[in-house]
């Protein structure tokens, strides 16, 4: 699987703040799925996407090295507007994954914001960079030629058991398909294997 990571940690880049809430929709807010695992069954995103439900369950389990802060999933389909996000994203994926447009008319994507539980790792950019190097190297070996893993290192501020500044990782899985069903299946399989990889000894022992 094609895998890469970048950093968006400049002074103008957004900071992930946890806990968070949507000012326009107070009912939409951070849920600590480590403490409230049964709330997974009631999240709109997980009700629609079983693969996302399973990934969140695995990543917030007691033996996981990370926990999650935000997530979303969405289809990527052709738009009549040549400047539309979906068209640009489809072109980008086809170019990087090496598939022609007639074979891959659609795609599916998701993101999950991750935070390392270990406070020393959470606060260290250097350790995050080492972990992201390791994760992208391991993910390349996964057999998902239609899928792409993108990781973005971001600044974070967490105030759950006392305030702390550190870093978060936005994990994107994007997958092309011959049709909507195959794109969705390719995405789900890739997401599942990346979640499993994150819970392997390579990262739990970090």
Where are the regions a protein language model picked out?
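Intrinsic disorder/low-complexity polar-acidic segments
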Residues: 69-206
């Amino acid at each position: 699987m094609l895998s890469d990571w970048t950093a968006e940690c400049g002074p103008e880049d957004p900071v992930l703040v946890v806990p968070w809430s949507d000012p326009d929709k107070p009912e939409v807010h951070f849920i600590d799925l480590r403490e409230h695992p049964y709330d997974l069954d009631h999240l709109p995103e997980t009700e629609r996407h079983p693969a996302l439900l399973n990934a969140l369950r695995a990543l917030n389990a007691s033996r996981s090295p990370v926990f999650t802060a935000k997530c979303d999933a969405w289809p990527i389909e052709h738009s009549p507007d040549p400047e539309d996000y979906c068209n640009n994203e489809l072109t980008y994926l086809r170019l990087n994954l090496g598939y022609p447009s007639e074979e891959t008319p659609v795609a599916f994507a998701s993101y999950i914001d991750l935070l390392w539980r270990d406070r020393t790792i959470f606060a260290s950019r250097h350790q995050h960079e080492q972990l992201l190097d390791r994760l992208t190297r391991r993910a390349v070996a996964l057999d998902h030629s239609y899928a792409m893993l993108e990781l973005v290192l971001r600044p974070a501020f967490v105030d759950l058991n006392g305030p702390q500044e550190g870093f978060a990782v936005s994990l994107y899985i994007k997958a092309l398909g011959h049709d909507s069903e195959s794109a969705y299946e390719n995405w789900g399989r890739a997401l599942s294997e990346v979640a499993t990889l994150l819970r392997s000894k390579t990262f739990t022992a970090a």
